[in-house]
Every structure is written in structure tokens, then in C-alpha cells.
Amino acid sequence: MAFDRQKLVEAVKEAKARAKPRNFTQTVEMAVNLKDVDLRKPENRFKLEVVLPHGRGKEPKIAVIADGAVAEAAKKLGLDVISGEELEELAKSPRQARKLAKKYDFFIAAAPLMPKIGRYLGRYLGPRNKMPVVVPPTMTNLEPIVEKLKKTVRIQLKNNPVVHAPIGTEDMDDEKLAENAEAVLNAIINKLERGENQVKSVYIKTTMGPAVKVER
């Protein structure tokens, strides 16, 4: 790979050093700028789920849209549950639906409710790349899915030749953040026709901090 792990570590270190202290733990983000990608062609756009080897650094907000067994399984794990009835209510309140789409990082949904989710929430979840992980209505153990989501980031290449991804939080070890960055980079490169030759540049920054270029 064209990006040396040590160069990623150095960029992470510098991005953290240049970030002013804030009264919250900042996310560390990566931007991958691409070249020679014709985004007018749908086959060149993509959505990806990447499991970060060292996790996201903070717990993602997960909601479960379900009734019955799946709802009970979600409650056992302390997850927020949206029932089929509440889903119907959201159809009458676009403002609440928008708010819901913004509030959670991931959704898990029981399969029978997917047609309604598509109808009532699709327009808010789709553009945010937050369509639910679908599970059968009889599932009684959501723990494996939840544990995986805790380490997962969703990324997409849509209208602009740049891919943004959170790779952890500023209180994480530099090496671990670099390994997370590497996992995301490799996933993106694997989707490109000419691989790393189509990566123009990579930047790392904290939420409020300046962007630091990763040297090659």
C-alpha cells in the first residue's frame, strides 16, 4: 500500500497535537480524496461498511425498530425501541422522523416492518446511509449484531470524489487510530478500479481541528 503505517501514525499525532482542547472528546476523522473517478456512472459510486479493528472509541447510538421477540431482545440490551405503532406515528410527523434519523448512528429492524420503514423513514435514512440492519422477527439475541455495529463505520462515495470516515476518538492510542485508518483506506482502495493510483490525498483531523495531510 502507498501509505506507510508510520506516516499514518505521524499524521494522527500531529492532528491531535494541533487540536485545541475542547470540553468534549473529539472524533478523529479521515478524508480520502480521489481522482479519475467518474461519479456520473453509478457503478463508480459505493457504500461500504468497515469494521474498525480497534472500535470507534465511543458507543454508537443504536435504535431497534421492532415488536415482539426482537423488541424484547433489544430491551434486554438497554437499546431504544421504536414499535410498529410508533413508526406509524412518525408518518404523520416528518419533523420527528428527521430528528430520529439524525439522533441514531445505526438502526436494527425486524423484517416485517421494512416496507413501512421504507415508506416512512426511507427518505431520511437513505441519504444519511443509515438504512437498518434487517433481522428475522423471531430473533432473540441481538448481541452479536450490536457488538459488530459498535466497531463499524459506514462510508459512501456519492456526488463528490471524497470519502469521509470517523476512525476513533482523540483519547485513543495513536497506533490504534492509524490501524483503524488503514482498515478504512484498504476498504476504499479495494473498491477502486485502479486501486491506490486513484487516491489523490489523505487528511486526518479532529472534529474541530485543522486537517493534516498524510505524507506518502
UniProtKB/Swiss-Prot annotation:
GO biological process: regulation of translation; translation
Function statement: Binds directly to 23S rRNA. Probably involved in E site tRNA release. Protein L1 is also a translational repressor protein, it controls the translation of its operon by binding to its mRNA.
SUPFAM superfamilies listed in its UniProt record: Ribosomal protein L1
Swiss-Prot/TrEMBL keywords: Repressor, Ribonucleoprotein, Ribosomal protein, RNA-binding, rRNA-binding, Translation regulation, tRNA-binding
GO MF annotation, one: rRNA binding
Subunit structure: Part of the 50S ribosomal subunit.
Organism: Thermococcus kodakarensis (strain ATCC BAA-918 / JCM 12380 / KOD1) (Pyrococcus kodakaraensis (strain KOD1))
Family: Belongs to the universal ribosomal protein uL1 family.
Source lineage: Archaea, Methanobacteriati, Methanobacteriota, Thermococci, Thermococcales
Keyword Heme attached: no
Annotated TM spans: none
UniProt cross-references to PROSITE patterns, sorted A to Z: RIBOSOMAL_L1
Protein name, as recorded: Large ribosomal subunit protein uL1
A GO term from the CC aspect: large ribosomal subunit
Signal sequence region: none
